[in-house]
């Protein structure tokens, strides 16, 4: 059997305050609020998706034992690092300036819990 067409669908991100995280990802970053459901007294599931992405993140209550702020290296591909930096800062998000490397242009920031994100503008590949 050949394995093909695998896609990452959902990544769980640990947070301390679900409402604060939802405000950050939806209102400040501008991501789509897909789902917010309290399943039980101990389980709340919130799913948000970056515009244009097929992969979402989820956070909530009772979803993971991971310590909030320990996710590092989460990466999103973007079309324009300068525009992304302007968007982040314009929405009150502290972000590092654009880091130009031969393999891409990068902007880094953290969510309110300290989970680390990197935005990457890909460089054209010579084929």
Predicted regions span which residues?
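Vicinal oxygen chelate
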Residues: 15-19, 51-53, 67-69, 73-116, ...
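Core segments of cupin and vicinal oxygen chelate
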Residues: 3-6, 13-55, 90
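Short, solvent-exposed aromatic-acidic interface loops
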Residues: 63-64
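Basic/polar N-terminal segments that are highly enriched at the extreme N-terminus
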Residues: 1-4, 126-127
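Residue-level "edge-of-site" marker
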Residues: 38-39, 101, 127
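Short beta->alpha transition motifs characteristic of CBS
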Residues: 11, 34-35, 119-126
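Positions in alpha-helical segments
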Residues: 6-9, 72
């Amino acid at each position: 059997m050949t394995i093909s067409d695998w896609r990452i669908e959902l990544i769980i991100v640990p947070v301390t305050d679900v409402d604060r995280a939802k405000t950050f990802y939806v209102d400040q970053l501008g991501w789509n609020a897909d789902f917010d459901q309290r399943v039980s007294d101990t389980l709340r599931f919130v799913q948000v998706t970056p515009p244009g992405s097929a992969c979402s993140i989820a956070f909530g209550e009772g979803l993971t034992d991971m310590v909030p702020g320990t996710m590092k290296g989460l990466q999103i591909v973007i079309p324009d690092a300068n525009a992304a930096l302007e968007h982040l800062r314009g929405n009150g998000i502290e972000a590092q300036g654009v880091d130009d490397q031969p393999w891409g242009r990068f902007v880094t920031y953290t969510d309110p819990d300290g989970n680390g994100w990197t935005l990457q503008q890909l460089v054209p590949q010579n084929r």
